Amino acid sequence: RVPNPAVERTQGKILLETLESIPRNFDIASASGESTAPIWEVILPMCTSSAELQRIYEYYRKIVVGKKSVRIADTTVSEWVGKFAPEEISLIPLVENREALSSADKIVGEYIDGKRFDYQRVFLARSDPALNYGSLAAVLLNKLCLQKLHALEKETSVEILPIIGVGSAPFRGNLKPTNAINCLKEYPSVHTFTLQSSFKYDYPESVVRRGVQEINDTKRGKPLHVNEEAVNRIIDKASGQYQKEVAALSQLIHTLSRYNPSRRARKLHIGLFGYSRSLQGISLPRAIPFSSALYSIGIPPELLGLSALSGKELDSVREMYVAFDEDISDSTRYICKENVARLPNGVGKNISRVLSNFDCRPDGEYSEAARDVLDVALSENRSNLTDAIMKTAWKRNFLG
């Protein structure tokens, strides 16, 4: 995974350094007796155009490998320092915002045009679209994207192999060892599911192995059909309401996220709403601390934004998102109705109205722990807030 100079201007040279390291890694592997290139694929995050891919593809071929035939003094570069391999690399676009997900077929189609590729991998983000537009919008965007990529595959005869990055939290995809089958049914055309740390480390080993086996044993199929017009109409309504409700809760989210236990360091992706996130002048944290903040006080974030949809629109969602009711009901295990009633600016009333459309299954012990988190967060003494947040995280088997 490399920086995208179109977005991360100050890290452009890191991209070039990374590309230059690929032949060096090949040399190390060759010295160890390996004949296969250890690095042959590069993921480009926040990809929004085929030109971004083409620049890297050509730079590697023309500059990194191409300099082998350049003469310096009395010899060529390759005669001087050895061969450069592999001859070319595969570029994987990571599409993360609504515009890129909706036009991924165009981005990929333009990039593969005129090239003799047997296959092309495409990486669909799941967590950051949820952070930007809401969980429902993220699911529908992914489904629409997969449908368009399948059409591109049939049109070009180039096998398109989608990757989807999902987390264990319902808000971020609900892919956990105990729910792998539902994800496979929801996204039958996906070739690769990325497994995040919660999947691997927060369940018994036997359960994790069974979940991985289920994923590996399932053959790819065709994507489930979605109506593009209905998808865009629902996303417009739900995401608009979601952003209003997030703005109303932003101060509380910030307070909680500051006490969220840090799991890893990661550079911000400048300019992407979900990374260095800004909404109506309000800055918000990344996906993990964001969702952890809301889950920890008993407010499942996948409920935000749904109040904008009518009963008929929810039925339309159910036709396209087969595990919709199950995912929402799963998330309501982590709800604290007392805390819902304490939310400002009408958000609590909106959530209560949403809950009437689903089978709500709150966990009493979890609700009590979530109430304690909010009590501490609203108090003057927050010294125990991180411990209180971790208590809820252990109960749900994921942080955020």
Residue spans of the language-model regions?
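Catalytic alpha/beta active-site cores
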Residues: 1-121, 191, 290, 310-400
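Glycine-centered loop/turn motif at secondary-structure junctions
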Residues: 64, 156-159, 298
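Acidic, glycine-enriched catalytic cores built around paired aspartates
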Residues: 191-192, 200-400
